[in-house]
């Protein structure tokens, strides 16, 4: 089998395993829904590195995330997995799959001549880790709250969003370009990485606060990716 075929098989096994883990933790270990949902969210976002590892063709590599646009919507509608879709859940899982798919189609070129995957991965990591930790810390430890566009958040959560986004953007743009995962990506200057990290984190924090009903899963990755591209 080619790496692309193996990548497809492993991707769906990985995704299925994530869903099962989230469901088992919720149903049998009584882990709260908001935590199991974020565990699955982080696991899904981190699989972008698995995609970069396995696939040599972006046309095939986008299939797993693209297919989960429809699958996540189905899961959301029928509430098949209570570990990720509670009664008050948003379409965030659908939006996240859409943003990753669109960014991959537009920017990921594993065979060259120029691959912009580091920028899109920076956007995905900001959403993967920044949003997850901001939501959890904001919910459980946030005491200073504000409401925008019908969504209530905390200043503590937004601060976490900024700091975590800054760290993951910096690490992504420092370590990924020119590596074995993205050999055709241009290596940015240190100044460009610092600018992208600070500006990207600021944009991620503001956009996350302004985006209602799970749409931050769409807006944050796209906006941070654009910042990374402009800074680089």
Language model features with spans:
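Interhelical loop and helix-boundary elements at the membrane-water interface
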Residues: 2-11, 19-61, 72-230
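Hydrophobic alpha-helical transmembrane segments in multi-pass integral membrane proteins
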Residues: 62-66
């Amino acid at each position: 089998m080619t790496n692309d075929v193996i990548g497809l098989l492993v991707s769906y096994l990985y995704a299925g395993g994530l869903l099962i883990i989230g469901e088992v933790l919720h149903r049998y270990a009584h882990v709260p829904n908001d935590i199991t949902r974020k565990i699955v969210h982080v696991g899904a976002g981190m699989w972008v590195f698995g995609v970069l590892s396995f696939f040599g063709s972006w046309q095939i590599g986008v299939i797993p995330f693209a297919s989960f646009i429809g699958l996540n919507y189905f899961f959301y509608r029928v509430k098949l997995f209570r570990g990720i879709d509670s009664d008050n859940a948003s379409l965030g899982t659908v939006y996240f799959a859409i943003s990753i798919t669109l960014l991959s189609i537009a920017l990921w070129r594993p065979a060259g001549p120029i691959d912009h995957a580091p920028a899109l991965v920076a956007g995905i990591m900001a959403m993967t880790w920044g949003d997850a930790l901001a939501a959890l810390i904001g919910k459980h430890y946030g005491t200073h709250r504000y409401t925008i566009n019908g969504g209530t958040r905390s200043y503590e959560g937004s601060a976490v969003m900024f700091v975590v986004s800054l760290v993951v953007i910096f690490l992504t743009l420092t370590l990924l370009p020119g590596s074995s995962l993205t050999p055709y990506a241009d290596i940015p200057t240190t100044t460009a990485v610092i600018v992208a990290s600070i500006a990207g984190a600021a944009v991620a924090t503001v956009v996350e606060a302004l985006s209602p009903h799970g749409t931050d899963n769409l807006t944050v990755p796209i906006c941070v990716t654009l910042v990374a591209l402009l800074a680089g």
